[in-house]
C-alpha cells in the first residue's frame, strides 16, 4: 500500500500551536484519511495514500487545521517513496552514527533563489555542513544543532518556500512507519 507523510511545522514546540497527538489523528481521520498513525506530538502524520498529489493533501490539511483550530500551520507532504529517496540521498552518511546531529528540512518545492545559501562560506561554519538536494536541505551539526551558528544562519536564509525540519531519528521512524 502506498502511503503519504504529512509534516506539520511548529506544532507543540515551546508551548506554541497546541495540537495534541489524539487531535491530529482525529482531524486526519475526519478528512477521510485511512490507516492513520501519528508519530510524536510534533506534527508527523502517516496515512494511506488518498489518491491526491502530496501538494493537494498538504493544502487540504493546512486549510482544515486553520478552520478547525484557528492555527496557521505550514504543511509539507511526501510519499513513502520520496521519503525513502531522502534517506538514500543523505550526503552525510557518517552522521548516521549520531542521528541527533543530522537534520533534514523538507521544502514544499525546489527554491527558485538559493543565492543566500550559495553565498555562505563553508569554512566559516566548520565542522557544521549543509547540502541542498532538490526539495531537501540536509544540515549536519556534529556539536549539536543548539550550538550551531550554521543552523541559525541557514534558518534565516529564507528560501521563499514552506519548510519544516526533522532530525534523522524522526526521519528514520517516519520511513519505518510508512513502509510498515
Describe the role of every protein-language-model region.
Residues 2-42, 46-180:
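Surface-exposed, charge/polar-rich loops and edge strands
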Amino acid at each position: 500500500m502506498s502511503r503519504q507523510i504529512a509534516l506539520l511545522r511548529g506544532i507543540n514546540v515551546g508551548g506554541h500551536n497546541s495540537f495534541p497527538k489524539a487531535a491530529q489523528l482525529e482531524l486526519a481521520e475526519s478528512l477521510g484519511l485511512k490507516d492513520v498513525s501519528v508519530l510524536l506530538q510534533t506534527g508527523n502524520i502517516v496515512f494511506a495514500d488518498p489518491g491526491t498529489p502530496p501538494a493537494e493533501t498538504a493544502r487540504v490539511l493546512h486549510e482544515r487545521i486553520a478552520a478547525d483550530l484557528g492555527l496557521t500551520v505550514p504543511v509539507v507532504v511526501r510519499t513513502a517513496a520520496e521519503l525513502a529517496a531522502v534517506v538514500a540521498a543523505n550526503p552525510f552518511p557518517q552522521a548516521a552514527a549520531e542521528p541527533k546531529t543530522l537534520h533534514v528540512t523538507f521544502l514544499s518545492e525546489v527554491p527558485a533563489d538559493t543565492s543566500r545559501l550559495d553565498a555562505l562560506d563553508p569554512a566559516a561554519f566548520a565542522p557544521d555542513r549543509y547540502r541542498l538536494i532538490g526539495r531537501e536541505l540536509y544540515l549536519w551539526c556534529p556539536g549539536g544543532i543548539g550550538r550551531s551558528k550554521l543552523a541559525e544562519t541557514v534558518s534565516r536564509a529564507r528560501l521563499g518556500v514552506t519548510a519544516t525540519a526533522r532530525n534523522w531519528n524522526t526521519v528514520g521512524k517516519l520511513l519505518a512507519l510508512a513502509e510498515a
